[in-house]
C-alpha cells in the first residue's frame, strides 16, 4: 500500500486539485510513491474543522498518513460585524484549535510529518472588487478581511509551530516578498492564481524534502517498467517495492 499524504484545510486546499493547483502538483511529484489526498472544505474555520478529525483521521487506523498539511486561518481571520462574521474565530481560539488538530494527529501517529501553513496575505482592494462583481451596489464597502488582521493569525501559526517543534510554511510573509503580489498570486484578493499555487507547492515541497519525505528517495509501489524483463516479467514482481 502506498503511503498517504493528506492535505487538510479550507477552500484554498479544496481548490488545490484544479488545473495548476498545488495539490495536483504534489500528486504528480509523488506519483507512484505516495497518494496525495485532498480534504479541503470551503468556508471552514478551525472551529468547524475539529468536528471532522475523527472521520478523516480515525484513531487506531492501521495505516495513518505519513504526512499532513494543516492549512486554515483565512476564514478564522474574517472580521466580526462584516459579511463573513459567521466564520470569525478569535485568534486565541484559532491557535488552540490548531493545537488540538496537531494533538489528534500525533495520537494517530507519533511519527507523522505535520506541516502548518499560514493563511495567505489579503489584497483588500481585490476583495472589494470581487464583492462588487458579485453583489454590485449591495456589496459592503468595508472589507470583510484585512491583511493586517490575517497577519496576526499567521504570526500565531508560526509561533505555535515553533512551540510544538513542527515545520511551518509562512505563506503570508513569503508571498509579500514579491512585487505586485496582490495581482500575481491572488485571483480575488484571497484565493490563489496558478502562480500563487506554485508558491505553495514550492514551499511545501521544500519542507517535505528538508524533513524526510523526498519523492526522489522513495521507492516505487511496483517495479519501474525498465526493470521488467519482457521474456520473464514475473521475476520483477516477486517482491513488491513497498
From Swiss-Prot:
Protein name: GDSL esterase/lipase At5g62930
Pfam (any one): Lipase_GDSL
Family of the protein in this entry: Belongs to the 'GDSL' lipolytic enzyme family.
Positions annotated as active site in the UniProt record: 11 (nucleophile)
Enzyme Commission number(s) from the entry: 3.1.1.-
InterPro entries on file: GDSL, Iah1-like, SGNH_hydro_sf
Keywords, in A-Z order: Hydrolase, Lipid degradation, Lipid metabolism
Domain of life: Eukaryota
Source organism per UniProt: Arabidopsis thaliana (Mouse-ear cress)
MF terms in GO: hydrolase activity, acting on ester bonds
GO BP annotations, alphabetical order: lipid catabolic process
Region (Disordered): 223-242
Record-level GO cellular component terms: endoplasmic reticulum; nucleus
Amino acid at each position: 500500500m502506498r503511503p498517504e499524504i493528506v492535505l487538510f484545510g479550507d477552500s484554498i486546499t479544496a481548490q488545490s486539485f484544479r488545473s495548476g493547483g498545488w495539490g495536483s502538483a504534489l500528486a504528480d511529484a509523488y506519483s507512484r510513491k505516495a497518494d496525495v489526498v485532498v480534504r479541503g472544505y470551503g468556508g471552514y474555520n478551525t472551529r468547524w474543522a475539529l468536528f471532522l478529525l475523527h472521520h478523516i483521521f480515525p484513531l487506531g487506523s492501521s495505516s495513518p498518513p505519513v504526512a499532513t498539511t494543516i492549512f486554515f486561518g483565512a476564514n478564522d481571520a474574517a472580521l466580526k460585524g462584516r459579511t463573513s462574521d459567521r466564520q470569525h474565530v478569535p485568534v486565541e481560539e484559532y491557535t488552540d484549535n490548531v493545537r488540538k488538530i496537531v494533538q489528534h494527529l500525533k495520537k494517530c501517529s507519533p511519527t507523522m510529518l505535520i506541516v502548518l501553513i499560514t493563511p495567505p496575505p489579503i489584497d483588500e482592494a481585490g476583495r472589494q472588487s470581487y464583492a462588487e462583481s458579485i453583489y454590485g451596489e449591495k456589496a459592503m464597502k468595508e472589507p470583510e478581511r484585512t491583511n493586517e488582521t490575517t497577519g496576526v493569525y499567521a504570526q500565531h501559526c508560526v509561533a505555535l509551530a515553533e512551540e510544538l517543534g513542527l515545520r511551518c510554511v509562512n505563506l503570508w510573509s513569503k508571498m509579500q516578498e514579491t512585487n505586485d503580489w496582490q495581482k500575481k498570486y491572488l485571483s480575488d484578493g484571497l484565493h490563489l492564481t496558478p502562480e500563487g499555487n506554485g508558491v505553495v507547492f514550492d514551499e511545501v515541497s521544500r519542507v517535505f524534502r528538508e524533513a524526510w519525505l523526498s519523492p526522489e528517495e522513495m521507492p516505487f509501489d511496483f517495479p519501474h517498467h525498465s526493470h521488467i524483463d519482457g521474456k520473464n516479467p514475473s521475476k520483477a514482481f516477486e517482491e513488491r517495492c513497498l
